[in-house]
Amino acid sequence: MKKTVQYLIVAALLLLVGGFITYRAMLTVPSAELAPEARVLAILEEGGCISCHSANPKVPFYAHIPVAGDMVMKDIEDGYRAYDIEPAMAKLKEGAMLNPVDVAKIEKVAQDKRMPMAKYYLVHWGSQMTDAKAAVIAAWARDYRMAYYHDGLSGERAGEPVRPIIANPDVDQRKVALGYSLYHDTRLSVDNTVSCASCHGLNTGGVDNLKYSKGVAGNMGGVNAPTTYNAVYNFVQFWDGRAKTLAEQAAGPPLNPVEMASTSFDEIIAKLAGDKHYVAEFSALYADGITEANITNAIEEFERTLVTPNSKFDQWLLGNNEALSADEVLGYELFKANNCATCHVGANLGGESYELMGLRQHYFEARGTELTEEDNGRYKQTQVERDRHRFKVPGLRNIELTWPYYHDGTRATMEEAVRDMALYQCDVVLTDAEVASIVAFLRTLTGEYQGQKLTSDNKQ
C-alpha cells in the first residue's frame, strides 16, 4: 500500500513537471525566420483572438456546458462589441498594410497583457501573452509605422502611435484660390446667407463653437460641427462616415434642408454663372466649366491645405526635447497608458476608425436625454446593428479651440471631455491631477496655419 502511494506521488510529480515543461514549451515565440507579420499572426492565432473578436467566432467545446457556456457567450459578445480583429488578421495573412488603429490596439493589448484573459489561457495552453511575444509585436508595430508614415521620426520616437504633421500638400494653387472663394461664398445656400465658413470659420478653429450649427432661416442642426482643419487626414468625413472624400463632403451641406437648403446644384450653378470672375476661373481650370463636380473639387483642393503643422508636440516628436514641459510629457504618457492612443492615432490623433460611444459604461443612458437620429452614428448609413452608436473618431489637433466636444456637443471643456471619455470608454476614473496633465498635453496639439499659431476669435 505504501509503495502504491509512493508511485502515485511520483507519477503526479512527473505529470506536473511534464505539464509545466510542455506549458513552457508552448509559450515560445514563433520562429524568427518567419516574416514579421507572419509571427504576429501566429501569436494572435495562438492567443485565440478570433474566438471572441469576430462576427464568426470559433466557439470552444465548453461553450455548451451550463453556466460556463453563458460566461463564454458573454465574453464573445463583449469581445466582438469592442473590436473585430478578423479584417486585421486577414490583412496579416495577405501581407497587406493594416489600419494604424489595428496596429495600435494589437500592440497595446500585448504590451499590457490584457488578452487573452486568464480564464482562457488556463484552458488553452500556449495562448498566454508573454514578454517575448509582446516584444515581437512591439518590434512589428514600430517597423510598420516607419514604413506606413513618411514623417522623419527616428530613434526612440520612431514607433509612436501618434505622428507629426508634415505639411507639404501637392495642390494646384489656382484651384486652392478658387476653393477658398467658394468656401466663403454664401451663394451656395438658398437665401445667400450661409457659407461653409459660417460653421467652419478659419478664424475660429474650423468650427463655430456652438453645440449645434445654425443653418438658413435660423434652423438648427442636430450634430456638433467637426473642424475642417486637418480633415484631409480623416479616412472618411462626417461623424457617420457618409462621405468618403472631402469633395463628397463638400457636396452635402449645400443641399441639406437645414444647413444651406439649396434645391439642387443647378440652382447654385445658375447663381455662380452670373459672376464673371467665377466663369473665367472655372473655364481656365476645368474644360467643362462650372459643374457640381468642379465646385466640390475646388473646395476639396482648398481644404487639403487646411493643415496645422509645427505644434509644440510635433516639435517634441521630431526631436526637440525642450518643446514640452515635464507635465506635458506626463500627460502624453497618461494619454497612452489609458488607451487613448489606440483610437486617437496618426497625424490627426483620430479620424482613422469608427468606435463605439460608451464602450465600458452606458453613455447614452447616463446622458439621460432622448435619443436622436444622430446618436445612431454609423448605423444611419449601414443599418447594421453593431454600428449603432459608433462614430468616426474625431481628430484632436487644435482641440483647445474646438469646443464644445463629442458628437452631441455636451461637454463644454476639455477637462469634462477627458474625464468622461476615460469613464465611458475605459471604465477608468481619472484623478484631477491626471486630467490636468492630459489636458496640458492636449493643448500642445495646437499647430500653425500659414506660418502663424492657430488662434480663435471666439473666447470660451
Regions found by a protein language model. Give the residues of each.
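Post-cleavage N-terminal segment of exported redox proteins
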Residues: 1-35, 113-178, 261-329, 333, ...
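N-terminal secretory signal peptides
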Residues: 48-54
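Short glycine/threonine-rich turn/loop motifs
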Residues: 42, 58-87, 156-252, 315-412, ...
